[in-house]
Amino acid sequence: PVLQVVRDIHGDILTPDSRYIL
């Protein structure tokens, strides 16, 4: 499946799984 990749305010690449691991 294709994961939606977004960037937080620091420019870090976040995925649905990693966005909770800050």
Swiss-Prot record:
Query: From what superkingdom does this record's organism come?
Result: Eukaryota
Keywords (alphabetical) are:
Protease inhibitor, Thiol protease inhibitor, Vacuole
- What does the entry list under GO cellular component? vacuole
Protein biosynthesis in keyword set: no
Q: Which molecular-function annotations from GO does this UniProt entry contain?
A: cysteine-type endopeptidase inhibitor activity
Q: In which tissues is it expressed?
A: Tubers.
Q: Does the keyword Cytoplasm apply?
A: no
Cellular location of this protein?
Vacuole
Question: Signal sequence: where?
Answer: none
Additional information? Does not accumulate in tubers infected with Phytophthora infestans. Has a single chain structure.
Role summary:
Inhibitor of papain (cysteine protease). Does not inhibit trypsin, chymotrypsin nor elastase (serine proteases). May protect the plant by inhibiting proteases of invading organisms.
Q: Tell me its family.
A: Belongs to the protease inhibitor I3 (leguminous Kunitz-type inhibitor) family.
What is this protein called in UniProt? Cysteine protease inhibitor 4
What is the protein's species of origin?
Solanum tuberosum (Potato)
